[in-house]
Structures are given as structure tokens and as C-alpha cells.
Amino acid sequence: MNSLLIITACLVLFVWAKEGYLVNKSTGCKYGCFWLGKNENCDMECKAKNQGGSYGYCYSFACWCEGLPDSTPTYPLPNKSCSKK
């Protein structure tokens, strides 16, 4: 019975986990990367305490994160376009 409860809880957390491109809150731009696929830098950024993700990799030259909490913003930010100055 306990194992069924644990499995159900894990599935619910997995289904409700957020994913998306990491975004720089000050510029509104995605975190860039060059090595597509498995990428240590993206994985490290996604797993950082202020992001809270479970896994990150490089997709379309930007860091894509999985398992993010709802509080972590992802690209695009509302009312903020990417401004590279």
C-alpha cells in the first residue's frame, strides 16, 4: 500500500513538473549554448538552487530545463522581449 502511494506521488510530480528554456530575468533572453544535446553547463544552470530543475540540456542553441518548479520563469517572459545591449 505504501509503495503504491509513493509511485502515485512520483507520477503526479513528474506530470506537473514544468519545463522550458531558462531565461535571464534582466534581459529577457534565453541562456545560450553551443554544444547541442547533453551539456554540462545547461545541466548545472538548470539544477542551480535558484532554478530548481532536475535536468538540463542544449536544444536549438539554448538551455532547455526539465522538472522546474512553477516559480522558475521560462522563456518568453510576459511583457519583456529579449534585449541584447
Curated annotation (Swiss-Prot):
Keyword annotations of the record: Disulfide bond, Ion channel impairing toxin, Neurotoxin, Secreted, Signal, Toxin, Voltage-gated sodium channel impairing toxin
PROSITE patterns: LCN_CSAB
Entry comment describing in which tissues the protein is expressed: Expressed by the venom gland.
KW Disulfide bond (keyword) present: yes
Compartments reported by the entry: Secreted
Principal location class: secreted
GO molecular function, one term: sodium channel inhibitor activity
Domain of life, per lineage: Eukaryota
Signal peptide limits: 1-17
Disulfides per UniProt: C29-C82, C33-C58, C42-C63, C46-C65
Propeptide residue span(s): 84-85
InterPro entries per the UniProt record, alphabetical: LCN-type_CS_alpha_beta_dom, Scorpion_toxin-like, Scorpion_toxin-like_sf, Scorpion_toxinL, Scorpion_toxinL/defensin
Domain LCN-type CS-alpha/beta, chain residue ranges per copy: 18-83
GO BP annotations listed: defense response
GO CC, any one term: extracellular region
Family note: Belongs to the long (4 C-C) scorpion toxin superfamily. Sodium channel inhibitor family. Beta subfamily.
Description of its domains: Has the structural arrangement of an alpha-helix connected to antiparallel beta-sheets by disulfide bonds (CS-alpha/beta).
Known role: Beta toxins bind voltage-independently at site-4 of sodium channels (Nav) and shift the voltage of activation toward more negative potentials thereby affecting sodium channel activation and promoting spontaneous and repetitive firing.
Name listed for the protein in its UniProt record: Toxin Cll5c*
Organism expressing this protein natively: Centruroides limpidus
